[in-house]
């Protein structure tokens, strides 16, 4: 399951750029279904590392909280729910390669803030790191966040 998670947090272009179809060095003792590709090795290593560091219950609670959250529940519509948010300014960052939170959802959120007459800034970023780009693409995100807080 963790390997599937890792794959969906990143974009296909990044996987292709980093690994393509590169194989591990040949081994004399290799069995039919042993790890053969570098990407498999990466996924195997990182999934084992992750499992040793995190309690799976954290993800159950996080997943449940995400399932239960609905901004429209607090006003009947997304726009009405967003109108109830009391902030001075809002930053929405969408990443074109994010398949978990697609860019059209971020655009819908920006449109909702616009209709609710909220002070917001919407930034659409290009990054090959997909959903994880907010963690690893410091160069792009830092600039946007810095500018937002210093405007």
Residue positions per predicted region:
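Alpha/beta-hydrolase-fold enzymes
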Residues: 1-49
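Active-site nucleophile elbow and catalytic-triad environment of alpha/beta-hydrolase enzymes
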Residues: 45-46, 62-82
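Acidic catalytic loop of the alpha/beta-hydrolase fold
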Residues: 49, 66-70, 96-101
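Long, compositionally biased charged/polar accessory segments in the mid-to-C-terminal portions
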Residues: 55-57, 61-62, 92
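Substrate-recognition/cap regions that form aromatic- and gly/pro-loop-enriched pockets
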Residues: 73-82, 97, 102, 120-123
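Short alpha-helix in the alpha/beta-hydrolase fold that links the catalytic acid
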Residues: 74-79, 89-90, 102-113
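Short beta-strand/loop motif that positions the catalytic acidic residue
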Residues: 85, 91-94
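Catalytic active-site module of serine/aspartate enzymes centered on a nucleophile-bearing elbow/loop
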Residues: 107-151
